Amino acid sequence: MPYPADAERRLRAIRGAMRDAGLDALVVSGSEYTGFDGAVLYLCGFQIVHRYAYVFVPLEGDPALVFPSEARYVGDHGSTWIEERVFADVPGEWLRDRARGAARLGVYGLDYVMNVRDYRALAAGDFEVIAFDEEFDLARAVKSDEELSAVREAVRINEAGFWTVLSAYEPGKTEAEIMAPAAARFVELGTGRHAMNMVLAHGPPGGARPEFVIPSETRKVGAEDLLLYSLEIGGPSGHWAEVSRPVMAGRPSAATADMLKAYVEYTEAARAVMKEGSTAHDVHTACSKPFRDRGFQLGHVTGHSIGMTMIEHPRIGEGNETELSENMVFSMHPHVIAEDGSCLYMQETWRIGRDDGEQLSSLEVKIYDGSEG
């Protein structure tokens, strides 16, 4: 199978980052751990169904796709454009042998993705093993036109899921009953298993608590329960999006109402600062200001680059001086916590623009009461 044009571009970008880092070869890890299969899909077109896989990328020559032998009949191995496909009893041993003669071997997924037995095999080699997550992510952070089209498709699917949640919402139902139709809709629209659907709920009247939990199949929702469904999906192409808004039929608490005002201000700040030339620190500073000015705490990370892996570098945070470029894509989701322990949390996917940021969904920044669906 010939390399698609965008695949050639991706490989050139990754090899450029390898040269900059002085690597002789690179191992790219992927597993079925939700959201962490995408680096393999990005480089070779193979969708991991079960277990894990690696792409071996030499600085020169053709890459190889490596599977554990027990995964021989798991997944469509003909979907990749990489010709050399290897099934190894211990993939790390095969990778170590292929990397023989290298001085510096990079590994994407070294800390979170790579199988322990394969790391042990690699570590026994005569080369230096180097973590390469940040460099890999930065090399793929600017999206091509084809990739942006896939991102927009994922956002449309994500937004459709939110409207399905809203249509299903009714006090007296369980959290899971409200979520279930959206999960089905996501699958109908091509997400497969690429979904991370949680909820922040169980808070004081008119509020939600800050912990992410699986929607309960037994807990019935009241009108004063603020529901913050965390809707995160990967579209048919494997590109991820995160879009959600709070839902509650009753009246928000004073703390929730104040956090909502800050969220509206944050959205305008994000639009102004998420542009070419800003740094990740600039974005964090501008976006956190409406919350900090009101004395709120920020819990979960403010935002992060998002692509075919759910969470990519750069992260939006204090002290991160990575400069942003047009057509990078970020998930932004300030995790705002009030003094009474209640929380407000919304997700939005943004494109870095030349002059300002582009919010990719059409959803208003507000608390939806169910009448809109």
Language-model region placement:
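Active-site neighborhoods and metal-handling regions in enzymes and metal-associated proteins
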Residues: M1-G373
